[in-house]
Amino acid sequence: MNLDIPLGSKSNYIEQNSLLRWIKYRTLSTLHYIDFQLRKDENELRMAFDTKNPFENSPDWQELEKIPAAGQIDRGLLTMHNGLRVLPTAYYGYGHGKLMQRSLGIHEPQEERLFHDILACIPANSTMMELGSYWAYYSLWFHKAVPQARNIMVEPRLSNLNYGQEHFRLNGFTGEFVLAGIGKDVKQDGELRIAGIDELMHELSVEKLAILHSDIQGYELEMLQSADKAIKDRAIDFFFISTHSDDIHQDCKSHLIESGYHILDDYRIAESWTPDGLIVAQSPELDRINLKPAVKKI
């Protein structure tokens, strides 16, 4: 049972039909539970049935403030640590949903603590672009924290893009959603558009991005190469780049340093509490902030 339907699938009409999506979202936890029982994936079984919070020993998890309702499900929605409400299993299914209940609505403790601290530096009327936005969690957080925020979500999978749209609706927010993949070579790959950062910023009339957040599964360096003009013009204040191999991590870090950006913090996959590494970088046009580093997992 595949609930996350790729673009071009014969079943894609579900994602294009508002009534069918409404039915899907209201039965999603049940559907994901059936999928979980049928697949019996070992990693998801561990996430679902473990009784411990996997992040309880992370100092960054401990530092993040959690509202009293964090991790609880109320009227079919999961409350995250900061009060945002999401579909409980939209982020990678039943196992992750159970994990986020135990972790009190935190799914990436190091990155979330860094993101929280950077948000304190973002002025009103700022714009964020999230690449590989999926459930749009970081965009939701930005929109909640920054007055008069503008949010742009870019995601290549229609079902994932729709999760983000539903989460914005559930939280009473509005945003701009773009169905596209990211690459340095602008093209049409079958039914999927491949776009670059410079192209998207021009197309969407974005003069400045306060945050560009990227989680695009191995295309990180291509993303930076597609932002050549924006980087030269210092049109991006902060980068949050999830990295998916040590080689890509080092290539991206070197590219940013060579472009004059300051690396505020970074950690590799082996140092992370989750499967991704991270690079946080700041434009040299800004006064360099004193960002407390994430605590690396030993």
Functional labels for PLM-detected ranges:
Residues S133-W135, L158, K184, I216-G218, ...:
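Short, glycine/acidic-enriched loop or turn micro-motifs at the edges of active sites
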